[in-house]
Amino acid sequence: MDNVDFSKDIRDYSGLELAFLGDAIWELEIRKYYLQFGYNIPTLNKYVKAKVNAKYQSLIYKKIINDLDEEFKVIGKRAKNSNIKTFPRSCTVMEYKEATALEAIIGAMYLLKKEEEIKKIINIVIKGE
């Protein structure tokens, strides 16, 4: 983590670049949460897969977007409006765009060292709020 250049302005990253990073962070945080329960690997994969997919991430995006700082709303909107060329068949185009927006927000929070904000979002997932 020490090799990441945090001095680059967050606006210099595209929405898709932020989503690329946010996707990895999202999955890592969800995996870390479920790992603590001592589940076997197939069970871990089942639980993680239920939370790391566009349909679910779209729901989380809708829950959090109105409560975010304006800076993160703008990042989410920019990512949502990115020129995404392919979409999975497991969700609608809008769900995929909203999931991309959530991932971009998570990626931006990570680069801005807003770990507590990421934890708040993860807690929504964990507590099912």
From Swiss-Prot:
The keyword Hydrolase applies. Coiled coil: none annotated. This is Mini-ribonuclease 3-like protein. It comes from Fusobacterium nucleatum subsp. nucleatum (strain ATCC 25586 / DSM 15643 / BCRC 10681 / CIP 101130 / JCM 8532 / KCTC 2640 / LMG 13131 / VPI 4355). InterPro entries: Mini3_fam, RNase_III_dom, RNase_III_sf. The keyword Nucleotide-binding does not apply. Belongs to the MrnC RNase family. The active site is at 23. One of its GO terms (molecular function) is ribonuclease III activity. One of its GO terms (biological process) is RNA processing. Might be a ribonuclease involved in RNA processing. Keywords: Endonuclease, Hydrolase, Nuclease. Pfam families: Ribonuclease_3.
